[in-house]
Amino acid sequence: MIYLGRANRQGLFVRADRRITPGSSIFRLDTRDGLVGTFRVIDTPEVADLALSNPADYLSGGCTALDLDNTDGVSAIVTENAGTAIFEDGRWKVLRKSRIRYE
C-alpha cells in the first residue's frame, strides 16, 4: 500500500509514501507488482477536510465527479470507481482517474 499526494496537471502524483503524511496524502494506491495499481481517496475525515478545502488543487488531477468544485454542505468523499496508475520514470502517473461523489 502506498499513499499518494495530489496529482498535478500532467497527471503525476506529487509524492508517494509508505505511511499517511498528514496534510499531503490524498490517495491510497494498492499494487501487487509495484508497476500498476488502483487508487482511491483515503477515507478519513482529515483527508476529506483537506481535499474539500480546495478540490481543484487536491482532487482534479486524480478524480472526476459530477460537480467537483461544489462542496457546500459536504463532509465526505466516496470513491465510486478506483482510478488506475502506472509507475513510470520513478513516479506514479494517472492512467485513468477515479470517479468520486460527495456526501
Regions found by a protein language model. Give the residues of each.
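Charge-dense, E/K-rich amphipathic alpha-helical interfaces
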Residues: 1-54, 85-86
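Extended, amphipathic alpha-helical stalk segments that mediate dimerization
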Residues: 34-103
